Amino acid sequence: MVKILVLALVFSLAHAQDFAELQGKWYTIVIAADNLEKIEEGGPLRFYFRHIDCYKNCSEMEITFYVITNNQCSKTTVIGYLKGNGTYQTQFEGNNIFQPLYITSDKIFFTNKNMDRAGQETNMIVVAGKGNALTPEENEILVQFAHEKKIPVENILNILATDTCPE
């Protein structure tokens, strides 16, 4: 099974530069972080994806999402700027360095490192999809990424059902 996961990762990374699959409507399925407080309900980094666009050969990635604060959905759009190492940088609740790691036609696994204004670092994994839950194979990939990022498995939250924000 590990060989399958490695092959899936290699395949997805080899095709990661074909960002056409990234564009369109997306929903946050799962979010995980080494700092659970940041992604719990009402947490500043618990975001619900809505749309991704790429510009300038995807050197700029625009992500539109909602954050729920005080039971109110707040729509936000950020633009990530591609860095030389394949990561993107943007500002939201501090500085964020993110990267799409695993891409299929209906799922995207992102890693994100957030450094908030107080200097606290939070390592995250965000899985966006077209509305379907993770398959058992995708869940194994998620758990593997969580181990690599030192994110406890119990900090993996399925949040698709808690998304009450507008389309």
Swiss-Prot record:
Q: Repressor: is it a keyword of this entry?
A: no
Q: Which cysteines are joined by disulfide bonds?
A: C54-C58, C73-C165
In-chain residues carrying the UniProt-annotated modification Pyrrolidone carboxylic acid: Q17
Point out the glycosylated residues in this chain: N57, N85
Q: Where in the cell is it found?
A: Secreted
Pfam family, any one:
Lipocalin
State the GO CC annotations: extracellular space
Where would one find the signal peptide in this protein?
1-16
As for what it does, the entry says:
Acts as an aphrodisiac pheromone, reliably eliciting copulatory behavior from male hamster.
> Family per UniProt?
Belongs to the calycin superfamily. Lipocalin family.
- Please identify the protein, giving its name as recorded: Aphrodisin
> Which lineage ranks, top first, belong to the organism behind this chain?
Eukaryota, Metazoa, Chordata, Craniata, Vertebrata
